[in-house]
Amino acid sequence: EPDSSDGVITVSSLSKTGGVPRYHGALDITKDSSGYMVVNQVNIEQYLYGVVSSEVSSSYSMEALKAQAICARGFTYRKLGCNYRGYDADLDDTTACQVYNNFPETDSSITAVDETAGVVPTYNGEIINAVYFSTSCGTTTTSDQVWGGSMPYTCTRIQNTALDIPYFSNETAFQDFMDGKTDTDVVERNLPMYTWTVSYTDSEM
């Protein structure tokens, strides 16, 4: 644990995409048959500094970073105590939960968290399950189409400012959209994960 509340711990044996990670709070290190397990005990707001910087680029607008901070905070509160009790932890630092400390916190990620401190997304007074994705395929969808079960605050929405829907009434038009040949300006259309393929059997259809 650092000597001061704003101190950090560097773990030189770890390597993340953004370099050697540094951690606020304290580290609990235990050894088991497979190696060492490291659990970072940190307050949620400082944890979010490293989530926002790792989940979205700090070059994004401040309002986008604030939106990410609010979603990530809601996701965190919803997951506390759910899945990792066997490790004396609440979350892991990968896409299984939220990516944490893969890139160092930045002035922008700190500002986004600080300026939304304590704000969470709610529906009917309850914190929502604020799931989000790293790469948009041009539209969102409802929860029942992904996991089953209804979350009424999720909806299908085209991810562009005009909220217009491309012409999908025939196979050629749909294929042109999937191949990026249309003029529809949707978020992240030029990224590799913008389109993907899934297969269903006749019975599943």
Functional labels for PLM-detected ranges:
Residues 1-205:
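Conserved, single-site charged/polar hotspot
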